[in-house]
């Protein structure tokens, strides 16, 4: 899937890009409902917004708390990708999308995962998929794969845009940049960057093998 994603970049994403929005809306709606379902089983998980618990954790389990920061940083780094797309959409649509859909869905799902672990402390691996009912597991896996591909595409597009801007500002030497759309200036393809990204991404996947190792 990863190699295929990079291989089709030169064709542009204009045609398939029309389904990205609806798919992501379904994705965020799904993870929000999954989280809410488990929150209702253990509503006390909402207390985790109180910073007292984080301070208490660091005070009594400093080593474990420090190691847990790795997972926390992995959660928040995805937010940095929003800035890469600022030139495509502008500040207002991104802010509205973040506060109106993305942030509430993520909070509900992470609370739901915490609530699930309260009732199933032995299921500490792949918590997200373990909290999905068995009959819905396959559709959610397919949906998660689609969401991952779309998120990866957003990052690739963002890197292409940043590279093009850096070339225009003479921060990078001139390299080949192809326009893949006759109507949208932002639809570009940078072959050198595309293949360097592919090698780096495949190397990371083979090296770490899981997000927990990362």
Over which residues does each language-model region extend?
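The structured alpha-helical core of multi-pass membrane proteins
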Residues: 1-214
């Amino acid at each position: 899937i990863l190699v295929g994603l990079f291989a089709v970049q030169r064709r542009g994403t204009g045609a398939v890009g029309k389904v990205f929005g609806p798919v992501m809306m379904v994705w965020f709606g799904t993870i929000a409902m999954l989280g809410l379902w488990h929150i209702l089983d253990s509503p006390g998980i909402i207390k985790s917004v109180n910073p007292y618990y984080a301070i208490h954790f660091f005070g009594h389990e400093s080593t474990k708390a420090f190691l847990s920061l790795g997972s926390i940083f992995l959660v928040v780094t995805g937010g940095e990708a929003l800035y890469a797309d600022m030139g495509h959409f502008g500040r207002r649509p991104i802010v509205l999308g973040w506060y109106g859909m993305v942030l509430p869905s993520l909070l509900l799902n992470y609370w739901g995962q915490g609530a699930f672990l309260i009732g199933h402390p032995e299921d500490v691996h792949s918590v997200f998929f373990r909290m999905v009912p068995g009959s819905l597991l396959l559709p959610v896996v397919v949906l998660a794969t689609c969401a991952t591909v779309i998120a990866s595409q957003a990052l690739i597009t963002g890197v292409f845009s940043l590279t093009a801007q850096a070339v225009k500002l003479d921060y990078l030497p001139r390299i080949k940049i192809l326009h893949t759309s006759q109507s949208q200036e932002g639809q570009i393809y940078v072959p050198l960057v595309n293949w360097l990204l592919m090698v780096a991404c495949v190397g990371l996947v083979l090296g770490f093998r899981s997000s927990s190792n990362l």
